[in-house]
């Protein structure tokens, strides 16, 4: 488990060299996970630190391949919940996180809105 201060110290030591943009809907997903007590703030920092490490690795691969790198990966929280991040690099070293959702057995966990959309279709 990583506290906020430890996360910031580690990020400063490792010098993550990219900007991260998280759209408001993904940010709201983060906030709702904390509000619903599914994750503590420390667990969110832990997941975000894992994201940063993974991004750093993917960025090195993208630079080596000289192409836009688009990918996703899974992170397991300490309480057993699993999440999937999907992100894409832009040419100006900017990272865009465009998806974050909870998974069950590798598949997206259905929410009430997903069920309503499915019924409406």
Question: Where in this protein do the model-derived segments appear?
Answer:
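Ribonuclease/tRNase effector modules and their secretory precursors
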Residues: 1-121
């Amino acid at each position: 488990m990583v506290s906020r201060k430890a996360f910031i110290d580690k990020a400063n030591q490792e010098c993550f060299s990219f900007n991260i943009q998280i759209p408001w809907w993904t940010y709201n997903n983060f906030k709702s996970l904390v509000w619903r007590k599914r994750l503590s703030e420390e667990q969110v920092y832990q997941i975000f630190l894992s994201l940063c490490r993974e991004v750093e690795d993917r960025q090195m691969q993208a630079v080596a391949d000289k192409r836009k790198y688009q990918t996703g990966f899974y992170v397991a929280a300490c309480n057993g919940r699993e999440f999937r991040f999907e992100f894409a690099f832009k040419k100006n070293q900017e990272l865009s996180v465009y998806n974050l959702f909870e998974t069950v057995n590798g598949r997206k966990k259905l929410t009430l809105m997903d069920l309503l959309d499915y019924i409406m279709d």
